[in-house]
Swiss-Prot record:
Catalytic activity, as annotated: ATP + H2O + aliphatic sulfonate-[sulfonate-binding protein]Side 1 = ADP + phosphate + aliphatic sulfonateSide 2 + [sulfonate-binding protein]Side 1
E.C. number: 7.6.2.14
Species: Rhodococcus jostii (strain RHA1)
PANTHER family hit by this protein: ALIPHATIC SULFONATES IMPORT ATP-BINDING PROTEIN SSUB, TAURINE IMPORT ATP-BINDING PROTEIN-RELATED
Record-level GO cellular component terms: plasma membrane
Listed name of the protein: Aliphatic sulfonates import ATP-binding protein SsuB 2
Gene3D superfamilies linked to this entry: P-loop containing nucleotide triphosphate hydrolases
Top-level taxonomic group: Bacteria
Originating gene: ssuB2
Membrane topology: Peripheral membrane protein
Role summary: Part of the ABC transporter complex SsuABC involved in aliphatic sulfonates import. Responsible for energy coupling to the transport system.
Amino acid sequence: MAQDARRLEPAAVQVRSLVRGFGDKTVLDRLDLDIPEGQFVALLGKSGSGKSTLLRALAGLDYDVEGRGGTLTVPEEVSVAFQDSRLLPWLKVLDNVTLGLGRTGTSRGAAALAEVGLAGREKAWPSELSGGEQQRVALARALVREPRLFLADEPFGALDALTRIKMHALLQELIRRHRPTVLLVTHDVDEAIALADRVLVLDRGQIVVDEIIDIPKPRALGDSKFHEFRTTLLGALGVEVAAQ
């Protein structure tokens, strides 16, 4: 029933028979995917499974890939955040957020920084910020453009555990306010279950697991249904979980 419901809803992302390869290696193998408007999808997979390749294809950043085929339909308004915040070190924080926004940029950028808890840091240099603060700036830069599709490639992977928890809460609040469609690439199964409406597992260029996470938020690790999803997803990743 969940699969049918996904097909009936308007799709923000539609992928058909997507192929991406490097040399003799096929990374994405005739992959199909629909993501409805406003859905938060987390993408799991082993290293080399094609997660970042798919995200880069959706972002239009893989124009130099030789082995390619299939079709992609995505909104024009797309923003991307990476594990590395990719702030320009020669620009102050506000200028990083507002780059390319035009005359209304200053007020919009200041509001976006306030939204991520960095009011008053507009004139700071990126080097003066902690890793968590830099990722907050990256989120502000992405969402100030009001994207219809937000792509995030392990944006919290380099942060400590406490900062990650805080960033999870911030991301959920920002998504609630701005309501983009989201694709989050992560290696963290618990992060995927805690945040997403739907979790995919990519293996050998194909989606092998597609789960709707129907647990009310906030989601607790100790919840029995959380454990069931965790066991299923870890199993798909080749990790055995001891019975409880």
